[in-house]
């Protein structure tokens, strides 16, 4: 590379995200181009090269399964009540679910709901994991 392009690259590395976004808009206006069209090509090429799997892994998980792993024997009734409250199951079904631990209690729920349910069950003596 030339000294001039090296200097430009070094300057670009110091930009914040907001400044970089503003720079892209200015370049689009000045040269009459769109960065969106070329970005789509880069994403498509990355997906074809196997980079898509890495990108998917980097995405934050949005749905969780709440799994009752185990519980303290002395806390069985409290765990049973917490499971009934969370699932709306009857006493017999909730009891069967708790006794079958490890068992999935809820599937595909939002992160906040999953964490709240995990906290509620752990507070009464259950051991819960989110998957």
Curated annotation (Swiss-Prot):
One BP annotation, GO: translation
Database matches in InterPro entries: Ribosomal_bL12 (IPR000206), Ribosomal_bL12_C (IPR013823), Ribosomal_bL12_C/ClpS-like (IPR014719), Ribosomal_bL12_oligo (IPR008932), Ribosomal_bL12_oligo_N_sf (IPR036235)
Domain of life, source organism: Bacteria
Keywords linked to the UniProt accession: Ribonucleoprotein, Ribosomal protein
GO cellular component labels: cytosolic large ribosomal subunit
Gene3D superfamilies: 3.30.1390.10, Single helix bin (1.20.5.710)
Pfam families on file: Ribosomal_L12 (PF00542), Ribosomal_L12_N (PF16320)
GO molecular function: mRNA binding; structural constituent of ribosome
NCBIfam families: L12 (TIGR00855)
Subunit structure: Homodimer. Part of the ribosomal stalk of the 50S ribosomal subunit. Forms a multimeric L10(L12)X complex, where L10 forms an elongated spine to which 2 to 4 L12 dimers bind in a sequential fashion. Binds GTP-bound translation factors.
Biological role stated in the UniProt entry: Forms part of the ribosomal stalk which helps the ribosome interact with GTP-bound translation factors. Is thus essential for accurate translation.
Family: Belongs to the bacterial ribosomal protein bL12 family.
Protein name: Large ribosomal subunit protein bL12
UniProt lineage: Bacteria, Bacillati, Cyanobacteriota, Cyanophyceae, Synechococcales
Record gene name: rplL
């Amino acid at each position: 590379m030339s000294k001039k392009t090296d200097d430009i690259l070094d300057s670009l590395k110091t930009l914040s995200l907001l400044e970089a976004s503003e720079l892209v808009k200015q370049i689009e206006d000045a040269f009459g181009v769109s960065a969106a069209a070329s970005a789509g090509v880069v994403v498509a090429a990355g997906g074809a090269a196997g980079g898509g799997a890495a990108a998917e892994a980097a995405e934050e998980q949005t749905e969780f399964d709440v799994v009752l792993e185990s519980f303290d024997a002395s806390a069985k009734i409290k765990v049973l009540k917490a499971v009934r409250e969370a699932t709306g199951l009857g006493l017999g079904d909730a009891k069967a679910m708790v006794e079958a631990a490890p068992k999935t209690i809820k599937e595909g729920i939002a992160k906040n709901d999953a964490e709240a349910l995990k906290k509620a069950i752990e507070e009464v003596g259950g051991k819960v994991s989110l998957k």
